[in-house]
Amino acid sequence: MLRKTRLFTPGPTPILPAAQTAMAAYAMHHRTADFRGLFSRVLADLKDFIGTNHDVLVLASSGTGVMEGAVSNLTSAGDKVLVLSAGKFGERWADLAKAFGCSVEIVSAPYGETFELDDLRQKLRPEVSAVYVQATESSTGARHDIQAIAQLVRGRGDNTILVVDAITGLGTTHFGVDGLIDVIIGGSQKALMIPPGLAYCAISERAWKRMETTRSPRYYFDFRKARKAAARGESPYTPATSLVAGLAAALEFIRQMGDGDLIRGRQELIENAELAARMTRAGAEGLGLRLFAPSCPAAALTAIQAPSGTESGAIIREFHDRFGAVVANGQGEMKGKLFRIAHLGYYDSLDTLAILAALEQVLAQVTGRAVKYGAAVRAAQEVYSQYRQGANVPATAR
């Protein structure tokens, strides 16, 4: 029987067909006027996609590479930093900061939850040089209130730099960047609908000034080199030219979502993720399943607890073997306990209805229990119908 492979993971995500075509067709050398023009357009468009006037960098790297750069460029060994950690990727910030000799203090929250601002307030002392946090903790499906965190950090003065990993946040959540966030990081394989291999960030003037005095070793991820090259429409080292061409196509697609306005297109993309998230949560609850981050759900993905007595790996295998659907397991301490369905980037409402219909079949097979077929799809359809009738899609916790 024919079975297509479909990605429902929070990265990589499905690739935009126009981006596939652009990547296949582009074969220009990176030290040419053609590529400089392309790269300059991408940098300018990313400003609108992020929502910033800050300088933007694009590097051939995973998102973790630019996360590392946000530590090595902004700290020196011995600096005191705060890491807000509520999952696998918060733990990664702590590991990176320790690798560069920082004195790390952690503001923690349980997996699937978000932070108490009072905990951050108590630890945000004047000697803290930087705060590192995720916008969306994709290992748990939780979304953190970056605006509230940023206002608290900025309210403590100019000494503390705020760095936000928004790799699954950009394109799924609205951010107020300028004046609040010093470094915000994104990745190509998320809402931007192209393969892994590019990471990007916007950097404030405060952060650029900090780099003049920090002493951590850096070479490939020296942001100052990248900024100097970007001013010429280049990268300091060989860029991933085909991926840049794909990124340009994806940004143009988003612009057309907004009828020629990229900022409006970004808003449409975010609304699309919000709607899919609401549909997915309603569908899961329609089957009696428990959401993992119910108080702070992300728009990028939905984390769902495996039914009692069922290991989530069995659910994931059944999704793949029966339908060709690739769904993500939990990570860290939640591996085997939950599964994650993504809906950021190149997903639409039909994708959402399809994965929920598949979920009904998967649960019946894996648990051996009676499933009311249509329950998940019906619940999601009701959300979709309300949206089509003009009801606003309420934003989940930001």
Regions found by a protein language model. Name each.
Residues V177-Q189:
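Conserved active-site segment immediately N-terminal to the catalytic lysine
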Residues N53-L82, A86, G90-W93:
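Conserved beta-loop-alpha segment that forms the PLP phosphate-binding cup at the N-terminus of a helix
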Residues R290-R322:
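Conserved PLP-binding catalytic core of the aspartate aminotransferase-like
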Residues P14-I15, A191-A282:
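Active-site C-terminal subdomain of aminotransferase-like
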Residues E333, K337-R398:
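PLP-dependent enzyme catalytic core of the Aspartate aminotransferase-like
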